[in-house]
Amino acid sequence: MKIFLDTANIDEIKDAIEYGLIDGVTTNPTLISREQKEGRGFSDIVKDILKTVDGPVSIEVVATDYQGMIDQATKIHNLGPNAVIKIPMTLAGLRAMKTLSEKHIPVNCTLVFNAIQATLAARNGAEYVSPFVGRLDDIGEDGMEIINQIRTIYNNYSFKTKILVASVRNPVHVLRSMIIGADVITMPYDVIKKLAMHPKTDEGLSKFLSDWKKVSPDGSFPI
C-alpha cells in the first residue's frame, strides 16, 4: 500500500518527504490554481513538483475532447519521466486512455464514482483509477463501498490497474482502504499528519516526561 499527497504546495510536499510519509503526489486544476503566483505559472509549478518527488506525480488535462486530451497529455508527459496523466472518466476520456496506454504513457483515470466506470478504465489500460469516496459520502452514499466493489471486480478479472483512493477526508477512510486492500491512498497533508496522532499517545508522552523530571529535574538526559 502506498500513500500519495494530494497537493500542489511545494512546501507541504517537501515536509512530507522529510518525514518519509509519501510515495507520490496527486494534483488537480483546483490545487494548482491555489499555488499560482505572478511570474509562476502552471508549467513552473508542475516542473518543481516533478523534480522534487521521487515517485509518480498525477497531473490533469483540462481538455474535454479526445484530441485535446492527447495533445495536453503529450505535453505533460514530456515534462518529466514520473508524470502520470489524469484523464476524466468520460467517453472521450476512455478513448484517450486507450491511446495513451498503447503508447505506454501512464494514466490515472479521475472522477470515478462507481465500479462500472472503474472497470471500463481498467479495460482501457489505465495505470490508476481514482474513486472519490468523500464526494460520495457527501451525497449520502457509503463512499468506501465502491472501493470494496472495485477490489472484488479487479480480483475477479485479474486487472492490473491500481486502485487509488481519492477525496479522502479522514483517517477512517484510510483505515478502511487498507483493510479492503486499496493499492494507493491519496490525501491532503492535514489528513496525513492525523494518521500519526492519537490522544492516548499524547497523554502517555506527557506522563512519561512528567515522571522523567523525578529523575532529571531540568529534563536533561544525563548520559
Curated annotation (Swiss-Prot):
Any Pfam family hit: TAL_FSA
GO molecular function list: aldehyde-lyase activity; transaldolase activity
Compartments reported by the entry: Cytoplasm
CDD domains (alphabetical): Transaldolase_FSA (cd00956)
PROSITE patterns for the chain: TRANSALDOLASE_1, TRANSALDOLASE_2
EC number, UniProt record: 2.2.1.2
Keyword Repeat applies: no
GO terms classed as biological process: carbohydrate metabolic process; pentose-phosphate shunt
Role summary: Transaldolase is important for the balance of metabolites in the pentose-phosphate pathway.
Family note: Belongs to the transaldolase family. Type 3B subfamily.
Name under which the protein is recorded: Probable transaldolase
Source species: Picrophilus torridus (strain ATCC 700027 / DSM 9790 / JCM 10055 / NBRC 100828 / KAW 2/3)
Gene assigned in the entry: tal
